[in-house]
Amino acid sequence: MNIYCMRHGRTNYNDLCLCNDDPAQDVHLTDVGIKQAQSAALALRDIEFERMIVSPLPRTYQTAEIVNQYHSIPIEVHADLADIRSGFDGKPVSDYFAAISHDPLKARVNGGESLLDHKQRVLRFIDWLKVQKDKALLVVAHEETLRVLIAHFEGGVADAQLRDIHVGNCEYRHYVLHR
Protein backbone atom coordinates (compact mmCIF):
# COMPACT_ATOMS: atom_id res chain seq x y z
CA MET A 1 0.00 0.00 0.00
CA ASN A 2 1.23 3.49 -0.85
CA ILE A 3 0.78 5.84 2.07
CA TYR A 4 1.26 9.56 1.79
CA CYS A 5 1.58 11.20 5.21
CA MET A 6 1.00 14.95 5.27
CA ARG A 7 0.83 17.61 7.96
CA HIS A 8 -2.09 20.04 7.90
CA GLY A 9 -1.69 23.59 6.58
CA ARG A 10 -0.64 26.50 8.77
CA THR A 11 -3.26 27.59 11.32
CA ASN A 12 -4.11 30.59 13.44
CA TYR A 13 -2.84 28.64 16.48
CA ASN A 14 0.48 27.95 14.70
CA ASP A 15 0.83 31.71 14.27
CA LEU A 16 0.05 32.27 17.97
CA CYS A 17 2.26 29.34 19.16
CA LEU A 18 -0.65 27.80 21.07
CA CYS A 19 -1.44 24.15 21.81
CA ASN A 20 -4.64 22.66 20.42
CA ASP A 21 -6.11 19.23 20.90
CA ASP A 22 -9.80 20.17 21.32
CA PRO A 23 -11.83 19.80 18.09
CA ALA A 24 -14.34 22.36 19.40
CA GLN A 25 -11.78 25.19 19.41
CA ASP A 26 -11.81 27.61 16.48
CA VAL A 27 -8.53 26.51 14.96
CA HIS A 28 -8.51 26.92 11.19
CA LEU A 29 -6.15 27.29 8.27
CA THR A 30 -4.81 30.78 7.69
CA ASP A 31 -4.53 32.24 4.20
CA VAL A 32 -0.97 30.89 4.17
CA GLY A 33 -2.25 27.46 5.24
CA ILE A 34 -4.84 27.45 2.48
CA LYS A 35 -2.15 28.29 -0.09
CA GLN A 36 0.07 25.53 1.31
CA ALA A 37 -2.78 23.03 0.97
CA GLN A 38 -3.52 24.22 -2.57
CA SER A 39 0.14 23.75 -3.49
CA ALA A 40 0.17 20.24 -1.99
CA ALA A 41 -3.09 19.46 -3.79
CA LEU A 42 -1.50 20.38 -7.09
CA ALA A 43 1.59 18.27 -6.35
CA LEU A 44 -0.55 15.25 -5.38
CA ARG A 45 -3.21 15.58 -8.08
CA ASP A 46 -2.03 12.61 -10.14
CA ILE A 47 -1.86 10.15 -7.23
CA GLU A 48 -4.81 7.77 -7.36
CA PHE A 49 -5.82 7.89 -3.71
CA GLU A 50 -8.73 5.70 -2.69
CA ARG A 51 -9.38 7.46 0.62
CA MET A 52 -8.08 10.24 2.80
CA ILE A 53 -7.77 9.57 6.52
CA VAL A 54 -7.65 12.57 8.86
CA SER A 55 -7.58 13.29 12.57
CA PRO A 56 -10.66 14.54 14.43
CA LEU A 57 -9.24 18.07 14.49
CA PRO A 58 -10.85 20.31 11.84
CA ARG A 59 -7.58 21.66 10.44
CA THR A 60 -6.73 18.23 9.03
CA TYR A 61 -10.16 17.87 7.44
CA GLN A 62 -9.93 21.38 6.00
CA THR A 63 -6.54 20.52 4.48
CA ALA A 64 -7.84 17.23 3.07
CA GLU A 65 -10.86 18.96 1.51
CA ILE A 66 -8.53 21.24 -0.43
CA VAL A 67 -6.42 18.30 -1.65
CA ASN A 68 -9.61 16.39 -2.46
CA GLN A 69 -10.62 18.91 -5.13
CA TYR A 70 -8.59 16.76 -7.54
CA HIS A 71 -9.87 13.42 -6.26
CA SER A 72 -13.47 13.51 -4.96
CA ILE A 73 -12.93 10.52 -2.69
CA PRO A 74 -14.09 9.75 0.86
CA ILE A 75 -12.46 11.62 3.73
CA GLU A 76 -12.60 9.57 6.92
CA VAL A 77 -11.80 10.61 10.48
CA HIS A 78 -9.66 8.26 12.59
CA ALA A 79 -9.39 9.11 16.29
CA ASP A 80 -5.91 7.62 16.67
CA LEU A 81 -4.51 10.34 14.38
CA ALA A 82 -5.42 13.13 16.82
CA ASP A 83 -2.65 15.42 17.96
CA ILE A 84 -1.07 14.69 21.33
CA ARG A 85 -3.50 15.53 24.12
CA SER A 86 -1.17 17.98 25.81
CA GLY A 87 -3.37 19.16 28.65
CA PHE A 88 -2.46 22.70 27.56
CA ASP A 89 -5.20 23.43 25.03
CA GLY A 90 -5.23 27.13 24.17
CA LYS A 91 -2.03 27.76 26.13
CA PRO A 92 1.47 28.56 24.83
CA VAL A 93 3.46 25.66 23.41
CA SER A 94 6.45 26.91 25.42
CA ASP A 95 4.47 26.43 28.67
CA TYR A 96 3.71 22.84 27.66
CA PHE A 97 7.36 22.05 26.97
CA ALA A 98 8.40 23.68 30.26
CA ALA A 99 5.86 21.54 32.13
CA ILE A 100 7.15 18.27 30.66
CA SER A 101 10.87 19.15 30.70
CA HIS A 102 11.53 16.96 33.77
CA ASP A 103 10.54 13.83 31.79
CA PRO A 104 9.72 14.64 28.14
CA LEU A 105 8.81 11.06 27.23
CA LYS A 106 6.61 10.08 30.15
CA ALA A 107 5.30 13.30 31.70
CA ARG A 108 1.53 13.73 31.76
CA VAL A 109 0.24 17.16 32.76
CA ASN A 110 -3.24 18.56 33.32
CA GLY A 111 -4.86 15.23 32.44
CA GLY A 112 -3.06 15.01 29.09
CA GLU A 113 -1.14 12.13 27.59
CA SER A 114 2.60 11.58 27.50
CA LEU A 115 4.66 11.38 24.33
CA LEU A 116 4.87 7.61 24.82
CA ASP A 117 1.08 7.38 25.30
CA HIS A 118 0.64 9.26 22.05
CA LYS A 119 3.17 7.02 20.30
CA GLN A 120 1.21 3.91 21.33
CA ARG A 121 -1.98 5.44 19.93
CA VAL A 122 -0.30 6.17 16.58
CA LEU A 123 1.19 2.68 16.46
CA ARG A 124 -2.36 1.34 16.91
CA PHE A 125 -3.29 3.36 13.81
CA ILE A 126 -0.42 1.72 11.90
CA ASP A 127 -1.75 -1.70 12.93
CA TRP A 128 -5.14 -0.62 11.57
CA LEU A 129 -3.49 0.48 8.31
CA LYS A 130 -1.91 -2.94 7.86
CA VAL A 131 -5.30 -4.60 7.38
CA GLN A 132 -6.69 -2.02 4.95
CA LYS A 133 -7.04 -3.07 1.31
CA ASP A 134 -6.42 0.30 -0.34
CA LYS A 135 -3.65 0.75 -2.88
CA ALA A 136 -3.04 4.40 -2.00
CA LEU A 137 -4.09 6.52 0.98
CA LEU A 138 -3.46 10.08 2.05
CA VAL A 139 -3.12 10.53 5.81
CA VAL A 140 -3.46 14.13 7.01
CA ALA A 141 -2.39 14.64 10.60
CA HIS A 142 -0.20 16.68 12.95
CA GLU A 143 3.53 17.12 13.38
CA GLU A 144 3.59 15.13 16.63
CA THR A 145 1.62 12.29 14.99
CA LEU A 146 3.72 12.37 11.83
CA ARG A 147 6.91 12.10 13.87
CA VAL A 148 5.76 8.69 15.06
CA LEU A 149 4.74 7.63 11.54
CA ILE A 150 8.08 8.80 10.11
CA ALA A 151 10.05 7.04 12.86
CA HIS A 152 8.11 3.84 12.21
CA PHE A 153 8.46 3.86 8.42
CA GLU A 154 12.04 5.16 8.25
CA GLY A 155 13.33 3.37 11.35
CA GLY A 156 16.41 4.13 13.41
CA VAL A 157 14.75 6.78 15.59
CA ALA A 158 14.87 6.36 19.36
CA ASP A 159 11.93 7.64 21.38
CA ALA A 160 14.12 10.41 22.81
CA GLN A 161 14.78 11.61 19.23
CA LEU A 162 11.14 11.82 18.10
CA ARG A 163 10.91 15.54 18.67
CA ASP A 164 14.06 16.07 16.59
CA ILE A 165 11.97 15.24 13.51
CA HIS A 166 10.55 18.40 11.94
CA VAL A 167 7.59 18.32 9.56
CA GLY A 168 6.55 21.59 7.94
CA ASN A 169 2.96 22.54 7.26
CA CYS A 170 1.64 20.59 4.25
CA GLU A 171 4.93 18.73 3.96
CA TYR A 172 4.27 15.14 2.93
CA ARG A 173 6.22 11.92 2.69
CA HIS A 174 5.53 8.76 0.72
CA TYR A 175 5.93 5.28 2.18
CA VAL A 176 5.15 1.78 1.02
CA LEU A 177 3.52 -0.40 3.64
CA HIS A 178 4.13 -4.08 3.04
CA ARG A 179 1.38 -6.24 4.49
Q: What does each of the following model-derived ranges do?
A:
Residues M1-Y4:
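Extreme N-terminal starter segment of soluble prokaryotic enzymes
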Residues V27-H28, Q69-L123:
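Phosphate-handling substructures
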Residues H8, H142:
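Short, conserved phosphate/pyrophosphate- and ester-handling motifs at nucleotide-, phospho-/glycolipid
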Residues R45-E48, L129-A136:
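Glycine-rich phosphate-binding loop signature in dinucleotide/nucleotide-binding domains
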Residues V54-S55, Q120, V140-A141:
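Short beta-strand scaffold positions
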Residues E143-R147, E171:
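GST superfamily/GST-like fold recognition
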Residues G156-R179:
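Domain-level recognition of soluble alpha/beta enzyme cores
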Residues G9-H71:
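Active-site-proximal alpha-helix that buttresses catalytic centers in soluble enzyme cores
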